[in-house]
Amino acid sequence: MTDTNVLANSATDNQETTHFGFETVRKDEKVHKVAQVFHSVAAKYDIMNDLMSGGIHRLWKRFTIDCSGARPGQRILDLGGGTGDLTAKFSRIVGEKGHVILADINNSMLNVGRDKLRDSGVVGNVHYVQANAEELPFPDNYFDCITISFCLRNVTDKDKALRSMFRVLKPGGRLLVLEFSKPILEPLSKLYDTYSFHILPKMGQLIANDADSYRYLAESIRMHPDQETLKGMMEEAGFEQTTYYNLTGGIVALHRGYKF
């Protein structure tokens, strides 16, 4: 085999593999592995969110809503919206003339979210769609705002997903990415590592009977692009005036970009 063939085969291998936590897997395999994680945790997802963050995730999401610019009558996509925390808030903001779509690739998460919102009386202006972020099944220039909350790190091809989000946003529309990121203080980073890799899996085992899924959660956070890298990825996808806000010392970051 020639050197050229070796390089070509290597390039093909690189295109076909990605990371699942710290593990290198084929891209199609990651889709199935991530699906298994969220099928497993869906029923206990809200309880674990409160326990893992001490309830602070509610403040992060409230800040996201405040930065969204959502107004009555607008169309909002809550992508990877899971159990519907943001959807419920957007539903009240956009009102009867507005429209919120809760989209998630995982039907278990989508079912939990739909049942929770309907039980809470959130009906009428909310619809549910099972969709892949990389290939959104919506028209061009359709949404006024898209949020993707604690989901992007699980997407296999993040660049493709960002381009897909850009396509379905209206000119003047906003994308907000709320995601775990990189702590900006070294002491906090060390403490967070200890919590993530030693305490979090034990909590997952105790509450959800699933340590492995929460070990993946910790690993997926470490493999996710840092704040500046994600900002650059959004700009490469076409977003402008892209900024980010570090929340809780950078444990979480909110990125916002516009389509013009």
Swiss-Prot record:
Signal peptide: none
One term of GO molecular function: demethylmenaquinone methyltransferase activity
SUPFAM superfamilies: S-adenosyl-L-methionine-dependent methyltransferases
Key words of the record: Menaquinone biosynthesis, Methyltransferase, S-adenosyl-L-methionine, Transferase, Ubiquinone biosynthesis
PROSITE patterns the UniProt entry points to: SAM_MT_UBIE (PS51608), UBIE_1 (PS01183), UBIE_2 (PS01184)
Pathway: Quinol/quinone metabolism; menaquinone biosynthesis; menaquinol from 1,4-dihydroxy-2-naphthoate: step 2/2; Cofactor biosynthesis; ubiquinone biosynthesis
A Pfam family reported for this protein in Swiss-Prot or TrEMBL: Ubie_methyltran
Substrates-to-products reaction catalysed: a 2-demethylmenaquinol + S-adenosyl-L-methionine = a menaquinol + S-adenosyl-L-homocysteine + H(+); a 2-methoxy-6-(all-trans-polyprenyl)benzene-1,4-diol + S-adenosyl-L-methionine = a 5-methoxy-2-methyl-3-(all-trans-polyprenyl)benzene-1,4-diol + S-adenosyl-L-homocysteine + H(+)
Disulfide bonds: none
Function: Methyltransferase required for the conversion of demethylmenaquinol (DMKH2) to menaquinol (MKH2) and the conversion of 2-polyprenyl-6-methoxy-1,4-benzoquinol (DDMQH2) to 2-polyprenyl-3-methyl-6-methoxy-1,4-benzoquinol (DMQH2).
Family: Belongs to the class I-like SAM-binding methyltransferase superfamily. MenG/UbiE family.
NCBIfam families: MenG_MenH_UbiE, PRK00216.1-1, PRK00216.1-5
HAMAP family linked to this entry: MenG_UbiE_methyltr
The protein's name: Ubiquinone/menaquinone biosynthesis C-methyltransferase UbiE
Protein species of origin: Vibrio cholerae serotype O1 (strain ATCC 39315 / El Tor Inaba N16961)
